Design a protein with these regions (language model features):
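Contiguous beta-strand/loop segments that form the cofactor/metal-binding neighborhood of enzyme cores
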Residues: 62, 74, 79-83, 88-219
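Beta-strand-loop-alpha-helix segment that lines the small-molecule cofactor/substrate pocket
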Residues: 3-4, 8-56, 70
């Protein structure tokens, strides 16, 4: 699978070529890309599926059955977490020995220039300039190549890589859909390695019409 910043580009190219698409989560790198993918899939008429492997997990299907039959009574609070507790779990992956500019196509990794421009414009318009690295993007970096999940320039962070699994599981079990509100906090509190993506995240989701709150935490 490609890095997050390539997902929508590949999905749209495949759809325009008339290919049905199975896209690993996350669907996109930015919010605008999400709508772009939706439009292209609609226009081309191909079959599209977003991949969450948890959909095949027996315990989630059993939980849906139990809650759906009312065996637990009203559910008002959901708590889920992702705790990795190791450098590898926090995306500090090994750098393959001998890797260099002659063995890695950096421009190809960086992605479509138009997508990059749209990303820069999106981040700037949302006053998130401090999280982007326009200077670093043009510089070859083994850390960024092998550990790309640590930078917003290529990644969707804890939410796009890990929370997405937990949220999909909850949605599969309880059919919660889109929440009324979501509030997050966190930061880069442990891995002081230059990353821009938080290594600690707390998110609260609210569904007032269902008297339901979901708490998510990740480290």
């Amino acid at each position: 699978a490609g890095p997050d910043h390539w997902h929508s580009t590949i999905a749209m190219a495949a759809a325009r070529a008339g290919k049905h698409v199975y896209c690993e989560k996350p669907l996109s790198w930015t919010v605008p890309e999400t709508y772009m993918v939706r439009q292209v899939i609609k226009e081309t008429g191909v079959v599209f599926q977003l991949g969450h492997q948890g959909r095949q997990t027996d315990c989630y299907q059993k939980a849906e059955e139990i809650i759906g039959n009312g065996l637990l009574g009203p559910v008002n609070l959901i708590e889920v977490c992702t705790n990795r507790n190791s450098p590898n779990g926090a995306w500090v992956y090994d750098i393959i020995e001998g890797s260099n500019p002659n063995t890695i196509d950096w421009k190809q990794f960086e992605g479509d220039p138009e997508r990059i421009k749209e990303y820069m414009d999106y981040m700037t318009s949302n006053k998130l300039e401090r999280y982007i690295g326009p200077d670093e993007r043009s510089k070859f970096s083994l850390e960024r190549f092998f550990r790309w999940r640590c930078w917003w320039d290529y990644s969707t962070g804890l939410s796009g890589d890990l929370l997405t699994h937990e949220y999909d599981a909850v949605n599969q079990i309880m059919h919660v859909g889109i929440p009324h509100s979501a509030t997050s906090s966190g930061g880069v509190y442990f891995f002081k390695d230059g990353r821009t993506v938080p290594d600690v995240l707390q998110t609260t989701f609210e569904w007032p019409d269902r008297d339901l709150t979901m708490l998510y935490s990740a480290t």
